């Protein structure tokens, strides 16, 4: 979950960011800085730095101690961070690890995770087509084995207004891989998704299928 930093905390983070990158001054121009714990990278926190100019968008950093990594400069965020921060992958961290990996992947550039109908602001009183979308949307399904996790997740492609059910393979130290995609056949041309990365979903139950291989 995101927490907005207090003014003194924000000043410290902004100064640290700008000391590392004085040219862009993301800290100086920050409108709001929020933090979220990353349970799969023990002791690390994710920082979301929102620029005062909306067109600039947000920048993300991971901080642990004196180590501050600007994620927008990395070609492969998740695989780099696995090596840099030391991954802990278990039933407690698997869902958030996948959310993080998907958001910063090539797939995450074109699709957003949809874990419940309210992620797209769809309610049960909607049109028949939207009720069809509600029936299609399912929570994450995670199967964990000794080499990583396989995840089934619903995603939304906003430019195409399409809702999918995707299957991914996530192996520590390697980029997220899309294995298969099922199209819902539903056109959601007026749906809204804010594309915010959500670490921790207290509004949702724990993903209903987490199975560790005994092999």
What do the predicted segments below correspond to?
Residues 158, 180-193:
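Short, solvent-exposed aromatic-acidic interface loops
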Residues 191-215:
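Compositionally biased, intrinsically disordered linkers/stalks adjacent to structured regions
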Residues 171-181:
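Short beta-strand edge/turn micro-motifs at domain boundaries
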Residues 44-46, 146-150, 173:
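A generic structural signal for beta-strand entry/edge sites
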């Amino acid at each position: 979950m995101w927490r907005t930093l207090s003014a003194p905390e924000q000043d410290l983070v902004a100064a640290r960011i700008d000391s590392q990158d004085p040219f862009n001054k993301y800290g100086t121009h920050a409108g709001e800085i929020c933090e979220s714990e990353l349970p799969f990278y023990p002791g690390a926190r994710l920082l979301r730095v929102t620029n005062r100019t909306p067109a600039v968008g947000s920048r993300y950093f991971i901080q642990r101690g004196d180590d501050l990594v600007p994620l927008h400069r990395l070609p492969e965020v998740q695989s780099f961070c696995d090596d840099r921060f030391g991954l802990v992958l278990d039933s407690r961290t698997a869902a958030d690890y996948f959310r993080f990996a998907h958001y910063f992947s090539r797939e995450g550039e074109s699709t957003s995770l949809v874990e419940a109908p309210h992620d797209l602001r769809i309610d049960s009183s909607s049109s028949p087509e939207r009720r069809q979308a509600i029936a299609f949307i399912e929570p994450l399904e995670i199967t964990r084995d000794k080499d990583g996790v396989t995840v089934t997740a619903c995603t939304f492609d906003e430019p195409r207004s399409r809702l999918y059910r995707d299957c991914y393979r996530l192996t520590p130290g390697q980029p997220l891989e899309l294995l298969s995609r099922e199209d819902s056949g539903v056109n959601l041309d007026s749906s809204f998704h804010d594309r915010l990365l959500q670490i921790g979903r207290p509004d949702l139950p724990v993903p209903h299928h987490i199975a560790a291989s005994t092999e």
